[in-house]
């Protein structure tokens, strides 16, 4: 059995809970306060008693108004209570006593009609009630007596008899309240449809708990003059509304201001009122205004997403259309909503498997790796420190290290295909194809001044050696010769010790090596080095014994020396071909060319001319008028004008091709050396030359290579060992010879830079501040002036303007044509920077035979010079019985009474020692001098 609390009954009565409880206690009910509960029977009795008392007199009107103002009645909407406006007391007094007389047939008929009615079908019943309420509100100020007489006469005309006290059929109009309906036994909880949630507030609305609902409009009502009799409430009918899904509760709204007693205007009850239920408070507006306001105040959370998106946005200035800011800017004045119904918020679960992959190319920076894994860079750095790697956020790590770090965070590393890898794939795709025969590439190697270039001159019938400074080759040269025996490409390499790298590159790009050995000189150092390079490259060697026309030529000695180096001649049972030549006398040149063709036939040299070009840089330089220029040896494919290529860290487009004679070429096939213009920079000699599909790919690859080179420099090991620490501490004592180096071509520059760096010793170091190809510029002068360096130019000369600037800045600029002259001057400059050394030389001995004491001077020893001579201001040692007592300087030297500059052997003299007076007879004075000796470069 359900129980009802007192404050719920107080709400039905429109009084405060405390006042209502006090009144019940005075009447003898056993309750303690407004929170006490009573059963349904007691609640019905309290309703009858209290309502009858309240209607009978006017003494409770003021208390009722106060209670209504303090506790406004609420209406249950969708499972929650919403405050309703309070009707002024005067209106309540006139309306609450209305009684309705309805025949039983009409009541039964209404019940039958109302049973199947749903929430949406209740509008016709509401429209029938509207005139009655409107009439009541309109005529509230009319006198009561005339109204009663008029209504009685109308009722009598319609029905002959009206009972004053109805106790059976219709005892009193049905009083329906939210609280009583909820607590009725067996009565289901009535919930309105969602579209009735918003309650219209009006200061002149009629209290829904005090107005009776007539069954039809043809029955007139009359105000009651007497209080109700205690008769029980009879339920005429109940409308079963569909139970709606319970929505999240919204905060209760409170009225913005208290109600004011003023004349109410005609109002229309809410169209959502159900039959037999309490009426909704009427809004003080016309039906048209009411409809528009209902549409405007429709619950937003009841709208569908499509309706909510189509709802008009906040109004701005007239004619202004927001096109760039979106709804966040336009709706900034609105109150934020509690949540978006249609927003699909993903739970904080793990990422999808497809998102747990990180693409890494060859390297990746720590910051990029952390960003792709969505973790802090400091955490990744901590992981790297745990692996023993000290890395910064901008430092790169390789793919293996990135894989270890990513695995700890649950990621998989996928290796991306870089442009560099794309070039490799492109090169592999070009492999195969139809190959045709090509001419051999022959490199001429040997010791300096053994006649390499002279042999080439004899073959080409040119005179290159005379044009070389000092008669030696200082550039790597490539020539294509068309001979009677066949076409041959020759690569001429320097023979000087400084050009080891050039000889190594020449051996790598060649098919056959011609080793030139002078018959009068034999095997030398660079000869042995050339043999090592050739054997390392697995290239066959043809020996040309040159200068056989000289008187002291010894061919057999050369063969013996070479046989010791695994180059046995064929006539001795070996596999090496020998040719005896004389370049100046044109002896043996044809036999040498035939040997070259024979070796080429044995190698079966072939290449595919239709594939993408692959070549090698033999030489590169920065030309003043043409920019970067490189000598390329095409190894495969056919190079044409307009081809895009990558060479080392640079890229470009073939804009012009020249042969070794300076003639323009349209294309160049395999084994053809050409000079290419159109590079973005000067490449290093030995770099690979690759033709790519387009300019975009070429630039991307060159940029990636440049970045990798820079990262390699920055990523050098920064760990300092104890030995390195001592080396750095001692570097302050090591002197430096700073050099700014300029050369005409890249290969010579590299060779000269390496040779200069090899001159460094423990005492003095050669430091190259800057090196580059091309002429000496103003920036070189300023750099040398700021760093106290010298400038060395190899095959380049400064202009008059640069010379004037060098004189102004006091910078030493030197130019050379022969490389070993430059190296000798650098060595002399290093020696000049060293501190000189001194050697001691004993010049004479003197024996003390007497002692004289001279005032203000001290003790003077009378000595006899036994050997050599004694010089003034020379050093002296005082020896007593072979033990050195003192080492100092001779203070005075006299012969008799005159000062002497020196005293020779066999003469007597007086010698005074500075700051030493303990001279005794028998001591030996040993005179010596310190001679300066020039310093030498150690190891």
From Swiss-Prot:
Keyword tags: Cytoplasm, GTP-binding, Initiation factor, Nucleotide-binding, Protein biosynthesis
GO CC terms of this entry: cytosol
Keyword Nucleotide-binding among UniProt keywords: yes
CDD domains tied to this protein: IF2_eIF5B (cd01887), IF2_mtIF2_II (cd03702), mtIF2_IVc (cd03692)
Segments for region (G5): 582-584
GO function terms (MF aspect): GTP binding; GTPase activity; translation initiation factor activity
Function: One of the essential components for the initiation of protein synthesis. Protects formylmethionyl-tRNA from spontaneous hydrolysis and promotes its binding to the 30S ribosomal subunits. Also involved in the hydrolysis of GTP during the formation of the 70S ribosomal complex.
Name the UniProt record assigns to this protein: Translation initiation factor IF-2
Taxonomic lineage from the root: Bacteria, Pseudomonadati, Thermodesulfobacteriota, Desulfobulbia, Desulfobulbales
């Amino acid at each position: 059995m359900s129980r009802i609390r007192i404050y719920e009954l107080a709400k039905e009565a429109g009084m405060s809970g405390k006042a209502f409880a006090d009144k019940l206690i005075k009447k003898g009910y056993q309750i303690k306060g407004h929170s006490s509960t009573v059963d349904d029977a007691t609640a019905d009795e309290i309703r009858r008693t209290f309502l009858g008392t309240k209607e009978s007199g006017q003494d409770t009107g003021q208390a009722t108004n106060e209670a209504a103002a303090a506790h406004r009645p609420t209406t249950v909407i969708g499972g929650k209570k919403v405050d309703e406006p309070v009707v002024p007391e005067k209106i309540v007094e006139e309306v609450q006593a209305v009684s309705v007389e309805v025949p039983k047939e009409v009541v039964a008929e209404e019940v039958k009609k109302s049973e199947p009615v749903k929430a949406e079908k209740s509008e016709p019943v509401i429209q029938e009630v509207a005139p009655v309420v409107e009439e009541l509100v309109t005529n509230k100020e009319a006198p009561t007596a005339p109204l009663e007489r008029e209504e009685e006469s109308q009722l009598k005309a319609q029905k002959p008899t009206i009972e004053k006290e109805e106790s059976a059929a219709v005892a009193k109009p049905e009083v329906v309240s939210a609280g009583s309906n909820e607590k009725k036994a067996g009565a289901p909880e009535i919930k309105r449809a969602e579209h009735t949630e918003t309650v219209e507030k009006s200061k002149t609305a009629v209290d829904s708990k005090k107005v009776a609902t007539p069954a039809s409009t043809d029955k007139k009502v009359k105000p009651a003059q007497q209080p109700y009799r205690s008769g029980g409430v009879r339920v005429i009918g109940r409308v079963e509304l569909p139970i709606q899904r319970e929505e999240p509760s919204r905060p209760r709204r409170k009225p913005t201001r208290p109600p004011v007693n003023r004349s109410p205007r005609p109002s229309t009850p809410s169209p959502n009122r159900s039959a037999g239920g309490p009426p909704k408070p009427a809004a003080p507006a016309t039906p048209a205004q009411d409809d528009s306001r209902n549409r405007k105040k429709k619950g937003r959370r009841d709208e569908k997403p499509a309706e909510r998106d189509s709802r008009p946005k906040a109004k701005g200035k007239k004619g202004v259309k927001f096109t760039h800011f979106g709804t966040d800017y336009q709706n900034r004045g609105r109150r934020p909503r509690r949540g978006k119904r249609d927003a699909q918020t993903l739970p904080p679960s793990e990422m999808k498997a497809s998102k747990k992959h990180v693409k890494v190319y060859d390297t990746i920076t720590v910051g990029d790796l952390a960003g792709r894994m969505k973790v802090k860079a400091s955490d990744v750095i901590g992981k790297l420190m745990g692996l023993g790697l000290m890395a910064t956020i901008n430092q790169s790590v390789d793919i293996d290290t990135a894989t270890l770090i990513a695995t700890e965070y649950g990621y998989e590393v996928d290796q991306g295909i870089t442009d560099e890898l794309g070039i490799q794939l492109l090169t592999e795709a070009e492999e195969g194809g139809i190959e045709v025969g090509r001419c051999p590439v022959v490199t001429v190697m040997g010791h300096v001044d053994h006649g390499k270039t002279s042999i080439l001159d004899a073959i080409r019938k040119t005179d290159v050696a005379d044009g070389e400074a000092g008669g030696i080759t200082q550039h790597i040269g490539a020539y294509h010769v068309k001979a009677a025996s066949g076409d041959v490409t020759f690569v001429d390499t320097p023979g000087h010790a400084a050009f080891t790298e050039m000889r190594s590159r020449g051996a790598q790009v060649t098919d056959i090596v011609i080793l030139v050995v002078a018959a009068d000189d034999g095997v030398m150092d660079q000869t042995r080095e050339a043999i090592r390079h050739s054997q390392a490259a697995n290239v066959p060697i043809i020996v040309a014994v040159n200068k056989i026309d000289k008187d002291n030529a010894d061919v057999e000695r050369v063969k013996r020396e070479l046989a010791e180096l695994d180059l046995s001649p064929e006539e001795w049972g070996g596999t090496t071909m020998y040719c005896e030549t004389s370049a100046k006398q044109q002896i043996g040149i044809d036999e040498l060319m035939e040997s070259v063709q024979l070796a080429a036939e044995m190698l079966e040299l072939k290449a595919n001319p239709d594939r993408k070009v692959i070549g090698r840089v033999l030489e590169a330089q920065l030309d003043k008028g043409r920019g970067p220029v490189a000598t390329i040896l095409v190894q495969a494919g056919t190079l044409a004008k307009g081809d895009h290529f990558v060479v080392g860290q640079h890229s470009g487009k073939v804009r012009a091709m020249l042969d070794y004679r300076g003639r323009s070429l349209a294309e160049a096939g395999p084994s053809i050396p050409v000079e290419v213009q159109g590079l973005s920079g000067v490449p290093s000699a030995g770099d690979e030359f690759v033709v790519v599909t387009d300019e975009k790919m070429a630039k991307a690859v060159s940029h990636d290579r440049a970045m990798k080179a820079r990262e390699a420099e920055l990523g050098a090991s920064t760990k300092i060992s104890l030995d390195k620490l001592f080396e750095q501490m001692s570097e302050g004592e090591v002197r430096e010879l700073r050099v700014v180096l300029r050369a005409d071509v890249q290969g010579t520059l590299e060779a000269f830079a390496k040779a200069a760096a090899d001159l460094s010793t423990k005492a003095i170091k050669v430091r190259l501040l800057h090196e580059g190809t091309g002429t000496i510029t103003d920036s070189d002068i300023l750099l040398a002036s700021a760093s106290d360096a010298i400038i060395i130019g190899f095959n380049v000369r400064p202009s008059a303007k640069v010379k004037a600037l060098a004189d102004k800045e006091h910078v030493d600029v030197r130019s050379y044509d022969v490389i070993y002259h430059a190296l000798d001057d650098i060595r002399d400059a290093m020696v000049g920077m060293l501190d000189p050394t001194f050697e001691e030389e004993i010049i004479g001995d003197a024996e003390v035979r007497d002692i004289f004491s001279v005032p203000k001077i001290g003790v003077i020893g009378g000595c006899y010079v036994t050997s050599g001579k004694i010089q003034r201001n020379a050093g002296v040692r005082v020896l007593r019985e072979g033990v050195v007592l003192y080492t100092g300087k001779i203070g005075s030297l006299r012969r008799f009474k005159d000062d002497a500059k020196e005293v020779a052997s066999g003469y007597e003299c007086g010698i005074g020692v500075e700051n030493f007076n303990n001279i005794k007879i028998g001591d030996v004075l040993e005179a010596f001098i310190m001679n300066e000796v020039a310093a030498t470069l150690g190891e």
